[in-house]
Amino acid sequence: IRGFGIKDVNDLVCWNKYLLETYGKDHKILMYGKEQGANTILNASGRHVLKNVEAIISDGAYTSPYDIIGYRLEADYKISKYPAISIIARHIKKAVRIDLKENTTKYVRHNDIPTLYFHAKDDDFVPLKMVYPLYNKNRGEKVLFVLKDEKYLYELVENDDFKQTLSQFIKKYMK
């Protein structure tokens, strides 16, 4: 996927339509996305183009491509994001017609699909601080769970808080 979660919305809508045409329009869908995939789902949810989607699980979403690329420039290459991000943004806009400043918070303001946001406290790709504007601007029902670390997700035990949160969320919205 090379649409930064923006152009990918059209692909997601096609998959959504395909699922309903193939398996029947009475099916309920839970969508899960990680990082860019989460942004794709969140961007689509605010446009009201998803059908039969009862719930969303967003894992490590970012506020905008502009923000995450700027962050990665500083974290990975130790260079100031300015003016590099401006040059990159202009090039991408010209080459593939994507505005990197397209902000997912603009779409979640209109999201009415229940959404579980989770993010690892020590996420080394998308910083934790990016989940808060998304969660705070989300109009619909929402839950936020901050994982103590990424590995924690794969070591779930029976009495685990996240496992319980996830289970309760799915049971509530996927009846």
Where are these regions (language model features)?
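Alpha/beta-hydrolase active-site loop
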Residues: 2-23
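Alpha/beta-hydrolase fold nucleophile elbow
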Residues: 23-35
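Glycine-rich nucleophile elbow surrounding the catalytic serine of serine-hydrolase chemistry
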Residues: 33-43
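Hydrolase active-site cap/lid region
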Residues: 43-97
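Short beta-strand/loop motif that positions the catalytic acidic residue
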Residues: 110-112, 117-119, 123
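Short alpha-helix in the alpha/beta-hydrolase fold that links the catalytic acid
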Residues: 113, 127-136
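Acidic catalytic loop of the alpha/beta-hydrolase fold
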Residues: 122-126, 152-153
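Catalytic histidine-centered segment of alpha/beta-hydrolase-like enzymes
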Residues: 150-163
